[in-house]
A protein has these predicted regions:
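Catalytic metal- and UDP-sugar-binding loop of GT-A-like glycosyltransferases, i.e.
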Residues: 11, 35-37
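Catalytic-site signature of metal-activated, phosphate-bearing donor transferases
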Residues: 18-24, 31, 35, 42-202
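Acidic donor-binding segment of Leloir-type glycosyltransferases
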Residues: 1-10, 14, 42, 46-52
Length: 205
């Protein structure tokens, strides 16, 4: 009620790709900027969005700064991620992936905008646990019958994920936050593939 230009739409969640395309169908403007509820556009990006002359044949990507609570995460693979978020809905859309959805860019150019999106993705340890369960289930559901898995594969995917995040991507430089993130990556990847293993077994019955 305080923001008459805002239209709140509620509906079923059918995976990230489908849900974002469904939400875009309600937009009255052709240009779609995807900003999640835990993300904030900084002043530089806001100015860029106001002044930029957009080209419908270009999909625009944004730079992301990640935070845990109010602590900026500068390593772990979270720092300065470039993610496609601005597009013309008459030209393209998101793919239908349940998780790891992305804007389709066939024959389109990609350009990065100035400024940043500040992503306050987690505020408690419990949120890591909840998201690990949710994302691993979506991954397993989306890949059941398409990808193979086994307990051994799940184990080594988890171990490598920790090593990659904490050592190769220097998560140790983020202090205890880096350890939390690396362990969360390990758990998420283990559950992704062990759930996929169970889903595939169910399909064979």
């Amino acid at each position: 009620k305080k923001f008459p230009n805002v239209n709140l739409i509620q509906g079923d969640f059918k995976g990230f790709g489908w849900t974002k395309n469904h939400a875009a169908s309600f937009a009255t403007n052709d240009w779609i900027l995807i900003i999640d509820s835990d993300e904030v556009v900084d002043t530089e990006l806001l100015a860029e969005l106001k002044n930029k002359k957009l080209d419908e044949k270009i999909v625009y990507k944004l730079n992301f700064k990640a935070f845990y609570k109010d602590i900026q995460v500068k390593h772990c693979g979270w720092n300065n991620q470039k993610i496609k978020r601005l597009y013309n809905k008459n030209i393209t859309k998101y793919n239908s992936n349940d998780v790891h959805e992305d804007i389709i860019t066939d024959s389109l150019k990609i350009e990065e905008l100035k400024g940043n999106v500040e992503h306050y993705s987690y505020h408690t340890i419990s949120e890591f646990i909840i998201k690990a369960d949710r994302y691993s289930t979506l991954f397993a559901s989306n890949n059941a019958g398409k990808k193979s898995s086994s307990p051994v594969k799940a184990f080594f995917n988890g171990i490598y994920s920790f090593f990659r995040t904490y050592i190769l991507k220097q998560g140790f430089r983020d202090g205890y936050v880096g350890l939390v993130i690396a362990f969360s990556h390990m758990v998420t990847n283990f559950y992704k593939y062990i759930k996929l293993y169970e889903f595939n077994k169910e399909l064979k019955k």
